[in-house]
Every structure is written in C-alpha cells, then in structure tokens.
C-alpha cells in the first residue's frame, strides 16, 4: 500500500492505494484486484493487477454462434472479441476515473489499462490498471502499463505464483 499527499480544491488530502483498491473491488466486473503500487518507482501513480469477471465475456455465447453458423469461427472473430473486451475495459476505465475525480475532488486523474493475458477459452482476462494523480501524457501511461504488464506476465503476478 502507498499513500499520496495531494492538494484538491478544499486543501490537502491523503489518498491511500488501499482505498482506491476498494473502489475497484466494489465493481462487479472486477473479479480480483491486487494492489502492486509499492512495486513500481513512479511518483503519484497507483497500479493494480486485476482480473476481469469470468461472467463478462463467456465462450458459451461463442459456442452458440458457432453452432448457429455451422462452421468454425476464424481468427477474425476472436480479434473482434478482443476489441470488444478492450472497449468494455475502456468504458470501465472512464467510469473509475470519473468516480475517483468526484470522490477526491481532483481534476488531474488519468487512468489506463493494459491486458497482459487472455486464456485460450476467452474466459480469463488479466490486466494492469494504472491511476495517475499527476499531469502525464497518455503515451507515458501506455508505455508504463505495457512494461508492468510484461513483468506481471513473466511471473510477478499473483495469478502465476
């Protein structure tokens, strides 16, 4: 857990990564959330290792479509499904960003995610979720999320312990 001392419109506030973790865990679409903020050396950025709920995108629906079509679905369909997942997480990211801005009365909050693992059944989605409490370019958040995602995939994640 880390704690940030920030200034908002009402004065000084402290934001604990454990409090933000509770916000993420309260979402029904996030099955698991682990605070890994202390593992990075980035000022005013919190990071979480997350797993999307298995109920959000289910292969049972895909199996039904396959049966209806009477043929195998090609890789294009899975590319479309992956883009649907990214769009879903982007919407969730926007909602979380807005919730944090409202809760802490902060304007300078940016959130970003990077999917680092999807199993072959398309039911297990793991991603890193970053929250920046400073003025930062989206390209910097993108690069940082990709680096952390690679680290999690290579064994730092609780999911692979």
Model region roles, listed by residue range:
Residues 124-161:
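Acidic, proline/glycine-rich low-complexity IDRs
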Residues 7, 49-51, 116, 130:
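A structural detector for beta-sheet-dominated domains
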Residues 1-12:
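N-terminal presequence-like segments and adjacent domain-start helices
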